[in-house]
């Protein structure tokens, strides 16, 4: 009887605090939202990296095209490239 009373008190306190008897069920939509945000960020970064390599003439043509230093995406790509070269990774 005491255990039953403890369980009912815990559920009542949880409901009063959160508006739901099982507050952990609210986590599932947040996980889906987080996964969507991560996938969106990854797709954005991959698209940006591909654009940078195309703009710099590394994909599809042999011309030596240059990008001004004011272009933040070009700066980001150059930083990525120098970091990889410094630590010994082979660049595409």
Curated annotation (Swiss-Prot):
Record's note on what induces expression: Expression is up-regulated in spores.
Which interval of the chain is the signal sequence? 1-21
> Which compartments does it reside in?
Secreted; Host cytoplasm; Host nucleus
Q: Which GO terms describe its cellular component?
A: extracellular region; host cell cytoplasm; host cell nucleus
| The keyword Signal appears for this protein | yes
Motif RxLR: which ranges?
48-51
- Residues of the region (Disordered) are 54-75
Keyword list, A-Z: Host cytoplasm, Host nucleus, Secreted, Signal, Virulence
Instruction: Name the family the entry cites.
Output: Belongs to the RxLR effector family.
The entry's free-text remark on domains says:
Has the canonical translocation RxLR motif, but lacks the canonical EER motif, which characterizes most oomycete effectors identified so far.
General function of this protein: Secreted effector that suppresses pattern-triggered immunity (PTI) in plant host.
User: What protein name applies here?
Assistant: Secreted RxLR effector protein RXLR-C02
Taxonomy of the source species:
Eukaryota, Sar, Stramenopiles, Oomycota, Peronosporales
């Amino acid at each position: 009887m005491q255990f039953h009373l403890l369980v009912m008190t815990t559920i009542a306190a949880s409901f009063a605090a959160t508006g739901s008897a099982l507050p952990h069920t609210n986590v599932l939509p947040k996980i889906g939202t987080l996964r969507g945000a991560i996938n969106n960020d990854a797709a954005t970064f991959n698209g940006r990296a591909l654009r940078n390599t195309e703009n710099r003439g590394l994909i599809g043509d042999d011309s030596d095209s240059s990008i001004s230093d004011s272009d933040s995406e070009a700066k980001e790509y150059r930083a990525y490239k120098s970091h990889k070269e410094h630590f010994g990774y082979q660049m595409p």
